[in-house]
Amino acid sequence: IETREELIYLLAEAAAIEHNVMCCYLYGIWSLKRGEQDGLSAEYAEIVKSWKAAMTDVAVEEMTHLTLVGNLATAIGAAPHLSRPNFPIPPGYHPEGVSLELFGFSHALIDHGIFLERPEGVALKDASEFVHPTDYHRTAPKGTIMPSAQDYETIGHLYRGSMHGFEALSHNLGEDVLFCGGVSAETHASAAPLPGVSVVTALASAAQAPDS
């Protein structure tokens, strides 16, 4: 990453995948029966309730990540990226290895979530229901006028790339120049009571945001 525009583009990509992953989790949650009113026994109703609670916690984490990515973008003078494609998402919008579709709650959906959230460097296979035969690669050649999409292995890989961009631009431009957005325009914890929401004012707080 050599320009502010390239960093903004990468943050928009991070926002889009967090938004889409969140939608997948929410769809899985709302596909579950609501309890005894939907014909479940009392025992199974409690089990389903615990599944919903666990999935909701994960979806809320995605909401936090989306909010923090918005704050990262705002901090460098851009606007939060909140648009996303409709489902089904066409090939090429995300890297080849990232398949995002709306599936009801199942073992496959759980395995898919684990695959999407896996740490960088961990080798896991996606659930077979989400693996599609595709053959495309997104590359971003140097020297182009406009930023373009490029591939990444994991969401953590994407954030690592963005943090390298923050570090490089902070060094080349200076933090005062890079972090030109007003903190008043960011989403504060008082406005979005999500766990881990914080504002970004400099390189140190930017580096903490992806780990929240």
Where are these regions (language model features)?
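Non-heme di-metal
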Residues: I1-S212
